[in-house]
């Protein structure tokens, strides 16, 4: 089996900058140009959201982006078609960075378990992050995903006890995803000495109880915070701030330009 792009990337000694983008946000036709802009400006991994009508773990910005994506016609099926087009350079320069789909279980169940996994791999998806999939209940899914060569990423939070951190680390295929705060995505601001000290203590604790790499997300908005996370973790994820920057765009071209400018500033 061909080595997964994520596995190849995490073997490198580099800090990762991971983008989260909701397809077809804010306008239809934006996805492929945005993927190209993010790749060209240094995104190491791109997470694509799978829009869902009841995203309980997401903040208002991502909830609105998901609703906009649904109105703009995004489905699991055509999202996989978009990834396929991105990989072969149909509508944009060929996207070669790893792509992770992040979303809730219901749309994937509706699509059909193994059928989804097979189609995801065929399209060029590298990994999955499902926030509502408890690690304790994931054994069957994890084995099926691994059999298709897909990376599975699980979440760690500031209140995750050490033994559970170790379990999540063992189950995550290549790396884990640490929530920087106990909040819905994008709603928390990382600021102030107390917050910084708490985050540092938390991530040091994660480091002590993990063998694999981990990235940090939720609430990271600028280069200063990216650099802060790079000192403590193996990568930073930026999503809500990117979507906020794109919100006022009216065309796919304008969306891509704003995405590129925003991402370049993070580097």
Swiss-Prot record:
Q: Which Gene3D superfamilies match?
A: Aldolase class I
InterPro entries per record: Aldolase_TIM, RibuloseP-bd_barrel, Trp_synthase_alpha_AS, Trp_synthase_suA
Catalyses which reaction(s)? (1S,2R)-1-C-(indol-3-yl)glycerol 3-phosphate + L-serine = D-glyceraldehyde 3-phosphate + L-tryptophan + H2O
Q: Which family does it belong to?
A: Belongs to the TrpA family.
- Record's keyword terms, sorted: Amino-acid biosynthesis, Aromatic amino acid biosynthesis, Lyase, Tryptophan biosynthesis
What this protein is called in its record is Tryptophan synthase alpha chain
Tell me, in a sentence or two, what this protein's role is. Answer: The alpha subunit is responsible for the aldol cleavage of indoleglycerol phosphate to indole and glyceraldehyde 3-phosphate.
Annotated active site residues, numbered on this chain, are 47 (proton acceptor), 58 (proton acceptor)
Quaternary structure, per UniProt, is: Tetramer of two alpha and two beta chains.
**Biological source species:** Chlorobium limicola (strain DSM 245 / NBRC 103803 / 6330)
Gene Ontology MF: a single term = tryptophan synthase activity
Entry coiled-coil feature ranges: none
One family name in Pfam for this protein: Trp_syntA
EC number in record: 4.2.1.20
Q: Which pathway is it part of?
A: Amino-acid biosynthesis; L-tryptophan biosynthesis; L-tryptophan from chorismate: step 5/5
Give the GO cellular component terms, alphabetically.
Answer: cytosol
């Amino acid at each position: 089996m061909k080595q997964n792009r994520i596995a190849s990337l995490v073997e490198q000694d580099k800090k990762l900058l991971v983008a989260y983008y909701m397809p077809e946000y804010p306008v239809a036709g934006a996805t492929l140009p945005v993927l190209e802009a993010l790749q060209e400006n240094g995104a190491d991994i791109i997470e694509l959201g799978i829009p869902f009508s009841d995203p309980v773990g997401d903040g208002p910005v991502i909830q609105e982006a998901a609703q906009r994506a649904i109105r703009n016609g995004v489905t699991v099926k055509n999202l996989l078609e978009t990834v396929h087009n991105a990989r072969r350079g149909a509508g944009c320069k060929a996207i070669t960075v790893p792509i992770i789909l992040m979303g809730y279980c219901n749309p994937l169940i509706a699509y059909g378990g193994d059928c989804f996994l097979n189609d995801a791999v065929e399209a060029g998806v590298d990994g999955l992050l499902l926030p509502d999939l408890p690690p304790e209940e994931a054994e069957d899914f994890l084995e099926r995903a691994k059999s298709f060569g897909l990376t599975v990423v699980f979440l760690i939070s500031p209140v995750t006890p050490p033994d559970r951190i170790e379990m999540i680390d063992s189950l995550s295929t290549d790396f884990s995803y640490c929530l920087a705060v106990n909040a819905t995505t994008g709603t928390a601001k990382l600021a102030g000495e107390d917050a910084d000290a708490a985050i540092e203590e938390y991530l040091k604790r994660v480091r002590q109880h993990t063998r694999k790499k981990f990235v940090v997300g939720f609430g990271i908005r600028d280069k200063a915070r990216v650099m802060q996370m790079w000192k403590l973790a193996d990568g930073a994820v930026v999503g809500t701030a990117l979507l906020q920057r794109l919100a006022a765009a009216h065309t796919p071209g304008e969306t891509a330009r704003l995405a590129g400018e925003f991402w370049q500033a993070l580097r």
